[in-house]
Amino acid sequence: MVQRCLVVALLVVVVAAALCSAQLNFTPNWGTGKRDAGDYGDPYSFLYRLIQAEARKMSGCSN
């Protein structure tokens, strides 16, 4: 039983490491880049407010 748990844990670690591997390349010539974070501010704030509203609704139901 312990050996099986160890094998499963090792398998999970290997799969997680394989999914997390990436290559990063940095260059000083990128400047500001093509995508500015300011363009995505409104959808993110909308999602944040939506999640807050749903959390308030759910907390009201638990009473």
UniProtKB/Swiss-Prot annotation:
It comes from the Eukaryota. It is found in: Secreted. One of its GO terms (molecular function) is hormone activity. The modification Threonine amide is found at T32. GO terms for biological process: flight behavior; neuropeptide signaling pathway. Keywords: Amidation, Cleavage on pair of basic residues, Disulfide bond, Flight, Hormone, Neuropeptide, Pyrrolidone carboxylic acid, Secreted, Signal. Its main location: secreted. InterPro entries: Adipokinetic_hormone_CS, AKH/RPCH_hormone. One of its GO terms (cellular component) is extracellular region. Residues 1-22 form the signal peptide. The modification Pyrrolidone carboxylic acid is found at Q23. Coiled coil: none annotated. This hormone, released from cells in the corpora cardiaca, causes release of diglycerides from the fat body and stimulation of muscles to use these diglycerides as an energy source during energy-demanding processes. Adipokinetic hormone precursor-related peptide (APRP) can form three type of disulfide-bond dimers: p1 (alpha-alpha), p2 (alpha-beta), and p3 (beta-beta). Belongs to the AKH/HRTH/RPCH family. This is Adipokinetic prohormone type 1. It comes from Schistocerca nitens.
